[in-house]
């Protein structure tokens, strides 16, 4: 089918419109089969951020307790949404995490809330959270659970129907699909109230013209990534472990912040005595791209809210790096990093 057909309005009754509708239906059914849900539960969005906003704001609006449960390690898409609702009157209770970045206490789930929101896997450390336990505990009180699975979809097996959660967000570019397209899996009951209004597309939960080409690309990428979860997970984990072990063997005073259960793609490491900005610039001089665990506020570097929630010291947090590996990462790439990283750390610590 041509890209032009995919760009036609799915509500048009002429031939190309019907073909566009068929492409969208195929994409929806494929996503449903891959993620273990019904096609009607698949809602296409513009991003994972939009999906998180629809779910959290929509489930909160549908509730009556004015209470939200979340964590202190969420992505800004969730963290800022919860903060906005708190400023408008929501009471927010936090699921605490331990030093490994995993949720350590589920007791706040024992009281009913309008929504409990938790990421499946952390974008900085890769820590995988006990989603099944969270859902079971929340379901006992009737609290709907939303899961930000942007980091997890395509990397871990997911069966939405078996999880017992109300909604789940994902973004295509995180599993090799096009940018600008995401998805929200949402049960018919409890369903999020719409936070925008218009043409009534996507069950009225996400009104607006659907990006049919994007949805088709999302479904194709998801099919490929899901088929490779086991093989790629094993390969990437081996490379991640090689990188971790090499760092520990060649550099003194290193703190590994990524702890199992963890995504195979993530390695978060602290180098006390080094500054994150210096690390990034020095790595860039060798064409090595990594992320710092700190954030910039008014020109002053500070460690991320994720590390703060974990209880990481300031010295460790400021000098931290996140390495992410993927399907294109090779053993030669890891060897190259290990060949240059000791020099980078030494120079950064001497600044």
What are the language-model segments listed below?
Residues 267-322:
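Conserved C-terminal alpha-helix-loop-beta "cap" of PLP-dependent enzymes
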């Amino acid at each position: 089918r041509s890209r032009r057909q995919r760009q036609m309005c799915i509500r048009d009754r002429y031939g190309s419109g019907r073909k566009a509708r068929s492409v969208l239906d195929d994409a929806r059914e494929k996503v449903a089969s891959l993620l273990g849900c019904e096609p009607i539960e698949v809602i296409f969005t513009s991003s994972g951020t939009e999906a998180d906003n629809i779910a959290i704001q929509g489930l909160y609006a549908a509730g009556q307790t004015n209470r939200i449960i979340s964590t202190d390690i969420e992505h800004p898409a969730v963290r800022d949404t919860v903060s906005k609702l708190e400023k408008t009157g929501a009471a927010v209770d936090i699921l605490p995490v331990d030093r490994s970045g995993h949720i350590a206490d589920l007791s706040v789930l024992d009281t009913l809330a309008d929504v409990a929101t938790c990421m499946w896997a952390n974008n900085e450390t890769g820590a995988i959270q006990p989603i099944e336990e969270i859902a079971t505990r929340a379901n006992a009180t009737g609290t709907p659970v939303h899961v930000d699975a942007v980091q997890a979809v395509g990397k871990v097996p997911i069966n939405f129907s078996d999880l017992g959660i109300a909604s789940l967000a994902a973004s295509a570019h995180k599993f090799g699909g096009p940018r600008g397209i995401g998805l929200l899996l949402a049960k018919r009951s409890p369903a999020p109230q719409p936070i925008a209004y218009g043409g009534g597309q996507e069950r009225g939960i996400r009104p607006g013209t659907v990006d049919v080409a994007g949805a088709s690309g999302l479904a194709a990428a998801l099919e490929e990534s899901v088929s490779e979860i086991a093989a790629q997970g094993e390969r990437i984990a081996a490379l991640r472990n090689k990188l971790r072990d090499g760092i520990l063997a060649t550099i003194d005073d290193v703190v590994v912040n990524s702890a199992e259960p963890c995504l195979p793609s993530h390695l978060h490491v602290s180098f006390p005595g080094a500054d994150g900005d210096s690390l990034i610039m020095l790595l860039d001089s060798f064409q090595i791209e990594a992320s710092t665990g700190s954030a910039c506020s008014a020109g002053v570097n500070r460690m991320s809210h994720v590390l703060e929630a974990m209880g990481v010291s300031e010295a460790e947090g400021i000098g931290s790096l996140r390495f992410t590996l993927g399907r294109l990462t090779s053993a030669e790439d890891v060897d190259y990093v290990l060949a240059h990283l000791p020099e980078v750390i030494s120079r950064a610590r001497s600044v």
